[in-house]
């Protein structure tokens, strides 16, 4: 017996309308729909259920849309007249929440783009038309104002995020390189951009707190011997060759340490220049340590508990494409990037399945390491020999020396940095490591080469500094005799009772010391400039001219130049990364004696970004052995942290142990550079505060604080390792649980199938 169909009949009792006294109002009301028909049904009486009534026919799509449109119009007019009841408000609120949810998640739906756009427009239109109806009574305007401000604030935040993304320098260039060459090459340019930001902060500190105050408030050029070119060098002080070596006018300028005055305060603001010079130098070192460690900890935090390689290729197939891309060029870059990611993943998968001949691999790796040690020893001896020759040349007349003799040491270091990485790359072919492991070995070897070269250079520089200090003692004694003879001759030129003009000697005629601090700054600036020029010439000759030869001579050559020898060059990741780190180490080491070095390095990094991006896209080809770069560049940052530590040690030794020059620089006249701190405490602080600070600087207390910091670092490191291990264990448990659930579901499905087959 089938259930009876029932129907509920609803009668509506309309309210009476108020009569209008004006004929014009009646005409308007005839044109508009009646107000009563737009109001919600107020009085409803349910009739007796009639079981014999026929079932209503289903509505078609047009009728449903018309009824929905009428309901929305009624809601809108009811909102204007403040006559919507609570039931309709709740229903409207639920619909608005649903539409907002659609707006937020429409791009995640597996629909066609046309359907997404249509649904999005419809949802936005519904929200904009009916959002104001949620306000009731006197609070409706305030609610509408709050909703409007919320929309504007959300739009402002979205535009601000877009603005911040647009302000990231060279983002499009790096994305294009990543799509063509993979994440390994792009990681170098990301590292270069990060180094550019670090050097920008260092330049702002040195320029605003050292160079600019001296230029604005210090004594002008020619007022003191330290700010004047000697008389013997005036004729050639502005020559290009002299300026290229950073002598002449460049030496006696704000670019170098020796130009700065040793007065405690300068200018109308009583700016303490010596104190500022010392604190900015220490601040640059501290900031560099802080920013490197912060970047490393951030990358470790992003790394989480390790990569989850479950269903790696499935995720790449179904989730790699961005369906909101509308630019054809961006789409091409995205396509190339996805292709490169698949190549990297396939290489990673194959590398884990390779079977090796263990004994042959061990022999080849031993042979490669033997050749590496020979190369490192030979390069160290070559630099030592070049330093000895440079010391011999320093004792000769500069006019008798040629260009090579003057720049031999810098050129030898630059050439070793250019050719030794190529040899290490050839040795790495014997070892047959995974590409990522081979890159780390190569970086480590080049790092050892450059670090050894740098410390050989520093040891030679320390010998030169000691010679300058001994020379200063003789010059100081000679200046005392010169002053005594000048005063004696001046007094002898007048009689006993006569008066003459005041005694005056032009600053260019005053004898002066060698100023070893300026000499150190000049060496680092020359080394930086020569390294930049060597890098650019190498790119032009080794990449651009080689690419032109292969491209245009391939048609008339005996063999295929593109796939045979010489072919196009691959981008040397290891050499470029180590050159960048080595150059930054020289900046940290020399910026205390040459405040202009961070500015010079900014120009170098800025031009390198454009020049190397052009060279990569124009002259290089992707590597034959692709590999995925580490998600965190902590390997690069770790080497940078090590070079930072090793670069600041000689600087701190010079600050603490060596006496400053007596006639140049902001610390002249003091026994040690750090004495400027004690002078400031004595003159500018109360005695009790100076006493407290001296007690805090007690070596026993400092050693205790350092020990506590080491223990805290050890504890935090152990805690972090434990948390990472716990995360890995949880991931394993979740995988095992998922596998068990999968097996249980399979067994249940098999049991159901067997039961169904048994019933049949």
Curated annotation (Swiss-Prot):
Chain positions with Phosphoserine modification: 37, 128, 314
Biased composition regions of type Basic and acidic residues, renumbered to the chain: 30-39
Mode of membrane association: Multi-pass membrane protein
Transmembrane segments: 183-220, 272-303, 360-390, 403-430, 435-469, 516-553, 573-593, 597-619, 634-657, 701-734
GO terms of molecular function: calcium channel activity; mechanosensitive monoatomic ion channel activity; voltage-gated calcium channel activity
Annotated tissue distribution: Detected in fetal cochlea, and at low levels in placenta and testis.
Coiled-coil stretches noted in the UniProt entry, renumbered to this chain: none
Gene it is expressed from: TMC1
Subcellular localization: Cell membrane
UniProt biased composition (Acidic residues): 13-29, 50-61
The protein's name: Transmembrane channel-like protein 1
Domain comment quoted from the record: TMC1 is structurally similar to TMEM16 channel and may include ten transmembrane (TM) domains with the ion-conducting pore placed between TM4 and TM7.
Pfam family, one: TMC
Phosphothreonine PTM positions: 45, 400
Region (Disordered): 1-80
């Amino acid at each position: 017996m089938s259930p009876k169909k029932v129907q509920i009949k609803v009668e509506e009792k309309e309210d009476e309308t108020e009569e209008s006294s004006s004929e014009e109002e009646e005409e308007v009301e005839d044109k508009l729909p009646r107000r009563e028909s737009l109001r919600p049904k107020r009085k409803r009486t349910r009739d007796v259920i009639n079981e014999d009534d026929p079932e209503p026919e289903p509505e078609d799509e047009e009728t449903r849309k018309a009824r929905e449109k009428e309901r929305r119009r009624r809601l809108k007019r009811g909102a204007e007249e403040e006559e919507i009841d609570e039931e309709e408000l709740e229903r409207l609120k639920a619909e608005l929440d649903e539409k907002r949810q659609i707006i937020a998640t429409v791009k995640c739906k597996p629909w066609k783009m046309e359907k997404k756009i249509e649904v999005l427009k419809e949802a936005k239109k519904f929200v904009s038309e009916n959002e104001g109806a949620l306000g009731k009574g006197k609070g409706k305007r305030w609610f509408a104002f709050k909703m409007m401000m919320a929309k504007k604030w959300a739009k402002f935040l979205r535009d601000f995020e877009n603005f911040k993304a647009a302000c990231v320098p060279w983002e499009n260039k790096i994305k294009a390189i990543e799509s063509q060459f993979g994440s390994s090459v792009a990681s170098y340019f990301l590292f270069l951009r990060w180094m550019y930001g670090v050097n920008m902060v260092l330049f702002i500190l040195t320029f605003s707190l050292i160079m600019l105050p001296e230029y604005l408030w210090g004594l002008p050029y020619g007022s003191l011997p330290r700010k004047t070119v000697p008389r013997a060098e005036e004729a050639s002080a502005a020559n290009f060759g002299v300026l290229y070596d950073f002598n002449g006018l460049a030496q006696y300028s704000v670019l170098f340490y020796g130009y700065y005055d040793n007065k405690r305060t300068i200018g109308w603001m009583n700016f303490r220049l010596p104190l500022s010079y010392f604190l900015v130098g220490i601040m640059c070192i501290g900031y560099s340590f802080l920013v490197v460690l912060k970047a490393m900890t951030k990358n470790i935090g992003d790394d989480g508990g390790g990569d989850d390689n479950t269903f790696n290729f499935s995720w790449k197939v179904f989730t790699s494409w961005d369906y909101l891309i509308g630019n054809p060029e961006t789409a091409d870059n995205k396509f190339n990037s996805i292709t490169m990611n698949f190549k990297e993943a396939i290489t990673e998968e194959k590398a884990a399945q390779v079977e090796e001949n263990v004994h042959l691999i061990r022999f080849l790796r031993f042979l490669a390491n033997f050749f590496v040690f020979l190369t490192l020893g030979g390069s160290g001896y070559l630099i030592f020999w070049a330093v000895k020759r440079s010391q011999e040349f320093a004792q000769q007349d500069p006019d008798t020396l040629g260009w090579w003799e003057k720049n031999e040491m810098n050129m030898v270091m630059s050439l070793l940095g250019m050719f030794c990485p190529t040899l290490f790359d050839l040795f790495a072919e014997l070892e047959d490591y995974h590409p990522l492991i081979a890159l780390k070995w190569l970086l480590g070897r080049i790092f050892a080469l450059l670090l050894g070269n740098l410390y050989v250079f520093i040891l030679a520089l320390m010998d030169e500094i000691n010679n300058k200090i001994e020379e200063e003692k003789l010059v100081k004694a000679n200046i005392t005799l010169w002053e005594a003879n000048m005063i004696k001759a001046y007094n002898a030129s007048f009689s006993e009772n006569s008066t003459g003009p005041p005694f005056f000697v032009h600053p260019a005629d005053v004898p002066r010391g060698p100023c070893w601090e300026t000499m150190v700054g000049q060496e680092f600036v020359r080394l930086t400039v020569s390294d930049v020029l060597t890098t650019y010439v190498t790119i032009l000759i080794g990449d651009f001219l080689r690419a032109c030869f292969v491209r245009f001579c391939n048609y008339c050559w005996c063999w295929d130049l593109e796939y045979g020898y010489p072919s196009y060059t691959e981008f040397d990741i290891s050499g470029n990364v180590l050159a960048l780190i080595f150059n930054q180490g020289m900046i940290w080491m020399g910026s205390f004696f040459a405040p202009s070095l961070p500015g010079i390095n900014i120009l170098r990094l800025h031009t390198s970004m454009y020049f190397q991006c052009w060279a990569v896209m124009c002259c290089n080809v992707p590597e034959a052995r692709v590999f995925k770069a580490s998600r965190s560049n902590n390997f690069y940052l770790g080497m940078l942290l090590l070079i930072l530590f090793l670069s600041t040690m000689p600087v701190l030794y010079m600050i603490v142990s060596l006496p400053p020059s007596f006639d140049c620089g902001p610390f002249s006249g003091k026994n040690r550079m750090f004495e400027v701190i004690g002078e400031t405490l004595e003159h500018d602080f109360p005695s009790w505060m100076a006493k407290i600070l001296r007690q805090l600087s007690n070596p026993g207390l400092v050693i205790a604080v350092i020990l506590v910091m080491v223990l805290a670092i050890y504890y935090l490191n152990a805690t972090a390792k434990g948390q990472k291990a716990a995360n890995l264990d949880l991931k394993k448990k979740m995988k095992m649980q998922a596998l068990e659930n999968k097996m249980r579901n399979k067994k249940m499905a098999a049991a159901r199938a067997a039961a169904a087959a048994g019933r049949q």
